[in-house]
A protein has these predicted regions:
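Conserved, well-structured functional cores that handle cations and Mg-NTP chemistry
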Residues: 1-185
Length: 185
């Protein structure tokens, strides 16, 4: 019985990895990474690292358990941190390229008469428990009608009424210097 459960678990993990591989292949994530300036500097390819990071929530893992303390990965945690923090990598461009490809696929699956819209949203990004985050500010939350620690998150997204895809986003601090709790370090 125990072997059967282990076998099913392994098969489910293989199916999940195959689905992620198919997604990365169908949307040519490697090409999009390259167009976004995210290239292999040394060691492991960025596609391999991004797949390993991308699959974490589907496996029920966080970054620490899936990358930092997992010795089965082909790369070390420092390589993953270097990929995510690379100052020359244009993650916003990657998001836009990927969103455009997904919008094209959704366009084939939906009715031509369906209305498509761009949505601009400025939600509050709450960081109430943070103290030393760069440009942390007191921002006004219009839904709760109070000030809180955090940022404004400006998001531009595409929607067809049933789906929403973020195209770009930015975290905004307060324009007023007196409302900023932390400066630039």
């Amino acid at each position: 019985m125990k072997n059967n459960i282990e076998y099913e678990k392994q098969q489910e993990e293989i199916r999940l990895h195959n689905k992620i591989d198919t997604f990365f292949d169908n949307f040519t994530i490697g090409t999009l990474l390259n167009k976004s300036g995210i290239r292999k500097m040394r060691g492991i390819s960025p596609v391999t690292m991004l797949k390993a990071i991308f699959i974490l929530p589907f496996e029920g893992n966080n970054f620490f358990r899936g990358i930092v303390s997992d010795n089965r990965q082909e790369f070390k945690k420092d390589a993953a941190y270097e990929l995510l923090k690379g100052p020359r990598y244009n993650w916003r461009k990657l998001l836009l390229f990927l969103a455009v490809r997904i919008v094209c696929v959704l366009g084939l699956l939906t009715d031509k008469d369906r209305k498509k819209v761009l949505i601009i949203d400025d939600s509050t990004y709450d960081r109430s428990h943070s103290k030393f985050v760069e440009l942390l500010a007191r921002v006004y939350d219009h839904s709760d009608k109070r000030y809180l620690r955090g940022f404004k998150m400006l998001t531009v997204g595409w929607s067809d009424g049933a789906s929403f895809l973020p195209l770009d986003f930015v975290l905004l601090s307060s324009e007023k210097e007196k409302n900023r709790l932390q400066g630039i370090t």
